[in-house]
Amino acid sequence: MDGSGPFSCPICLEPLREPVTLPCGHNFCLACLGALWPHRGASGAGGPGGAARCPLCQEPFPDGLQLRKNHTLSELLQLRQGSGPGSGPGPAPALAPEPSAPSALPSVPEPSAPCAPEPWPAGEEPVRCDACPEGAALPAALSCLSCLASFCPAHLGPHERSPALRGHRLVPPLRRLEESLCPRHLRPLERYCRAERVCLCEACAAQEHRGHELVPLEQERALQEAEQSKVLSAVEDRMDELGAGIAQSRRTVALIKSAAVAERERVSRLFADAAAALQGFQTQVLGFIEEGEAAMLGRSQGDLRRQEEQRSRLSRARQNLSQVPEADSVSFLQELLALRLALEDGCGPGPGPPRELSFTKSSQAVRAVRDMLAVACVNQWEQLRGPGGNEDGPQKLDSEADAEPQDLESTNLLESEAPRDYFLKFAYIVDLDSDTADKFLQLFGTKGVKRVLCPINYPLSPTRFTHCEQVLGEGALDRGTYYWEVEIIEGWVSMGVMAEDFSPQEPYDRGRLGRNAHSCCLQWNGRSFSVWFHGLEAPLPHPFSPTVGVCLEYADRALAFYAVRDGKMSLLRRLKASRPRRGGIPASPIDPFQSRLDSHFAGLFTHRLKPAFFLESVDAHLQIGPLKKSCISVLKRR
């Protein structure tokens, strides 16, 4: 039956049944609209699926629109049916189904269904048909981006038969059809803008993106799928770098926690010792007070008893004399003699009160200790929190250095031949910063650099070297231990560190790596290794090694260079200021290079440092090592 007639439903291609007129003027069967929008409801527009739209013109309906039967059109259809068999398209009973019928479309697959649903992966719930009755929905075969609904093979029939629906875009079943619509125009996303890298509908393509390079989504997907392997490879590399960075950060966190626990234990132990010393001093002072009190009380109480006894004897002798009868001369003489003897026995001066209590000076001694302790606590706290008085920063006291020496195993590993795995715990990923590269340096990604004869037109940058063929690594270092490796491919090269705030516009004689107090390096001059700092050079007797390890130790203010061979690390030179001997005598008074280190090297660590590289000869070429436990790959000369 031709579905283009004025009295036919564009969905089922049958004569209109219970006709409903939409605001745009198009007519549909009420049951067909209910089957097309089961998730919106047959009697209203809007809902969780988004704004309803006309299946023909795609005009959206206003929220809350109630679909009602068009009585005039219904009566016109009845009159048309009664005018004769030649005028009506079919018998009358087929035109008036019950309004309560859930759907006018068949609910079972027909033999002529356009396609069958593909099997879904095990354990995954398939997308259900939106036109099937609720509770008995079949798996969907396709989703319509125009109708915003999914259909099983049976309910896809109208999209195959109706000319008005054949232009709808059918895609494999989608769970969230709303994500395939333009949020602004509520139209299907069918185009891709390569300029702004967004998916567009036709309205967006004709308005905001006019003049941009627009391609179909399928074409862009095919192109992006070809690049997918490169993107995934880059993602894997970045994840590896992040994994190394995460491991390094975790080691730093663990180091901070362990150092804090150890320092907390040392402080608690020292405070306990100080408290024990104060407790012992308190016991001594209190004992001194008790001893002084007992001694002085013994003397005073003995004198008190003697005076009381003498007074008692005098009182008794006087009383006895007063009781002698006047006629008894013998008793009178005897009692008077006894009174005189008692008087003479105590007539000497007794000991007076003590002029000074010796134990009362105890409070003065304790007060002095308290005041000195308070002042010492304030001074030490200010020294602990305030900046150091010299450029070397906080240093260990000699007594603490003697009492708490550095771990011997770590010292031996850092200053002698050691397994490479030990240093990989401190691995740091170095990426070359193109904004610092001199115009005669060509970068290969972020890991390789080669000196060239023709200048490269780099963009202007305030951090770019202008007089020296140098380049820095990204990221500044200011604490902890860091290790990276450099592969010397060809030519004269230098590798080391440079202060972040060093001016890249310095002239050639002062701006080169190791020729100033703001940088130091290891140089390979084609014949031998040497180290440079503050304009002084110290030759090294070691043979050539194509792979050099660099270890920056902020805690010890040291920079070490190693030759890497077969998983072993051989120390080339460790740059560090020597500890002065007792009495202020320097450790190496006859070595000018070490003397320069002793006087200026620690000041380098007051700055944030960056990995630095200097390519001196015209054929110089180096590469940042991959820092993997497996053998380092041999790079071909470019």
From Swiss-Prot:
InterPro entries: B30.2/SPRY, B30.2/SPRY_sf, ConA-like_dom_sf, E3_ubiq-ligase_TRIM/RNF, TRIM47_SPRY_PRY, Znf-RING_euk, Znf_B-box, Znf_RING. Signal peptide: none annotated. Residues 88-100, 108-119 have a biased composition (Pro residues). It catalyses: S-ubiquitinyl-[E2 ubiquitin-conjugating enzyme]-L-cysteine + [acceptor protein]-L-lysine = [E2 ubiquitin-conjugating enzyme]-L-cysteine + N(6)-ubiquitinyl-[acceptor protein]-L-lysine. The keyword Acetylation applies. A zinc finger (B box-type) spans 177-217. It comes from the Eukaryota. Residues 302-312 have a biased composition (Basic and acidic residues). GO terms for biological process: protein ubiquitination; regulation of postsynapse assembly. The modification Phosphothreonine is found at T72. Its main location: cytoplasm. The modification Phosphoserine is found at S461, S588. Residues 79-119, 300-322, 384-411 are annotated as: Disordered. Pathway: Protein modification; protein ubiquitination. Low expression in most tissues. Higher expression in kidney tubular cells. Overexpressed in astrocytoma tumor cells. The keyword Kinase does not apply. GO terms for molecular function: ubiquitin protein ligase activity; ubiquitin-protein transferase activity; zinc ion binding. Zn(2+) binds at C182, H185, C204, H209. Residues 410-631 form the B30.2/SPRY domain. E3 ubiquitin-protein ligase that mediates the ubiquitination and proteasomal degradation of CYLD. This is E3 ubiquitin-protein ligase TRIM47.
